[in-house]
Amino acid sequence: MQLLPHDTVEDILERVPVKSLLRFKSACKQWKLTIESQYFQAKQLICSAGGKDLNLVLVSEVPKRYHIYQLFHNSCDGLVCLFDYQTLNNIVYNPATRWHRRFPVSSTNTWRYINPSSPYRINTSSSRGHALYVDGSLYWLTGKKEIKVLALDLHTETFQVISKAPFAEADHRNIITRSLNNRLCLSVSKPLQQMIIWSFNSENKTWEQIYSIVNRSVTQSLPVAILEKNKLLCCPRSNSRQLMIYDIKTKSVDSVSIGTYRCGDSVFCYFESLISIL
């Protein structure tokens, strides 16, 4: 039987789950070199993120007597960041491969400052100080009288303030930053009345209103993901054991059970990857 060209084999391997890819590294030397290459890992991540299957991470509370790690709010290229309360270390972890790397605390002088620094102070102790990662940049809400979006490009290490937002005068307590379809989105809610979701176009620096929802149960929820373009996956704020799928066209709501788990503020999409940090 004639062997398949290696390019064809690569196309097949890109669609294989990460757990299987780790086993396939033992099949032959060529497969091992392919799977461990940065080029293949980047292609596998694109394939995983663009697939129809959706993986969710639900963060549950556990008793403080256990040695626990705080999970930050979303993932980046299949990696999550954990904080160790005992050692005060940050840990980058790949749930799919079990790879991890521990980073030293800031007091060890192994970190450097970004210059020029942020034009606004980032208060990490408040909900507005929580960063959102989208497509190579970190985003924060900032400003007092006028809501603005602060962006940090991780490639150029430069800050930028995104002003002229259509929600600039909204109550910051009703604004939530989310990554939907790999774009920065903000939901602006009027509880029990309306939820408007804005999407940011990073190329022309403009905001586009993509949804306006008046369903009561949805306006009190957190948007998680866009499904099939016309459906919005939401998480209730009531620590529920169910997620909601809102159909934009029919304006109907379906419930999705998550078993014994409860959802809260920390619910985000996750895509498997082979990525690690050298």
Swiss-Prot record:
Pfam families: F-box (PF00646), FBA_1 (PF07734)
SMART domains per the UniProt record, alphabetical: FBOX
Domain of life: Eukaryota
Domain F-box, first and last residues per copy: 1-43
Protein name listed in UniProt: Probable F-box protein At1g14315
Organism from which the protein derives: Arabidopsis thaliana
